Amino acid sequence: MDSATRNPNYSPEVDPQPLPSTNPIHSRPIFSFPKRPALRITTEFDSESTVFFHKISCKFLDSLAKLKFAFHNNSKGEIAEPQISFVSKYLSLHYDLEDHSALVKSSVDVGPKLKLIGTHDVKAQQGEVTMVANLDDPGYALQLSTPLPSIALPKATFKFPQGEISLQEINDHDEDEQVKNSLSVSGTLKGQLLKGLCTAQYKDQEFKLRYRYKDDEMSFLPILSLPSNALSFAFKRRFGPSDKLSYWYNCDSNYWSAVYKHTYGEDFKFKAGYDSEVRLGWASLWVGDEGGKAKTAPMKMKVQFMLQVPQDDIKSSVLMFRVKKRWDI
């Protein structure tokens, strides 16, 4: 019989364990240096303009703000349009080193449903102040904006789920060079009609009617402008998950254009088309998402090759390319 069975008060001997140190000096290094923020370098090149565009940026303050430096340089190495930017959620500053001009943008949440947005050009001494008030019902908002220095009443825009309406005072000059104030009305109204979306837009005394029908294989978009009675329409047909044909025609000018697109996975795209207005045929190949960023492309690099063939002078065909590369350091 073992000792635990003979003596109910028996407890085995346990080696003593060292107690954890409560002195904070021994729990962290004597000298601690802040972690260097990650640098993001992006370079773009366009063979048509033979100009490089460079951008260097980094985030700091736990990604609450970003510092960016951007500039162009040509084939001779000359630097042009250098700009420094500081961007955060509530304040951004863009400074042009050549023009010595600064653009300041700021936004302040006055309340849970009220926001103030301000923009100021320091060199031009001009700016704009906008107030946005979100109403209790979702999708409804009232926006007031005025330029600084103010020369007219603020522009008022009322937004609702079916569109928006804007009222703005405009200062015109008559034949006697006297200032004449007038009220300008613009707006957009949209709604469902015959399994499609109908949109009516009025701006600058021009009225546009759009109707868009779209399903999994086809989309159709006619556009009518009044009072010019200009009519155009766009048609798109999908032949599978990788092939799509787009066609656009203007009934007044008889100009038309067509584009065929074929995708190879997510990173390769081939497009070919023709534009009758400029009498130009073209074809392009994209490596990387055409509308995406370089960080999602293979090797963080996007490349586009484009061949342009003029109909009237085939011998003057041009092959161009664009490259965009990103480095994370």
Curated annotation (Swiss-Prot):
Outline which residue ranges sit on the Chloroplast intermembrane face: 71-87, 122-138, 164-205, 227, 254-255, 283-302
Where it sits in the cell: the answer is: Plastid, Chloroplast outer membrane
Where does the transit peptide start and end?
1-57
Q: Where is this region: Disordered?
A: 1-29
Q: How does it sit in the membrane?
A: Multi-pass membrane protein
Which is a GO BP term held by this UniProt record? Answer: monoatomic cation transport
Q: Mention one GO molecular function.
A: monoatomic ion channel activity
Residues in compartment: Cytoplasmic: 58-60, 98-113, 149-154, 215-216, 237-243, 266-272, 313-329
Q: Where mainly found?
A: plastid
Q: Name the protein family.
A: Belongs to the plastid outer envelope porin OEP37 (TC 1.B.47) family.
Q: What's the protein here called?
A: Outer envelope pore protein 37, chloroplastic
Which organism does this record belong to?
Pisum sativum
Q: Gene encoding this polypeptide?
A: OEP37
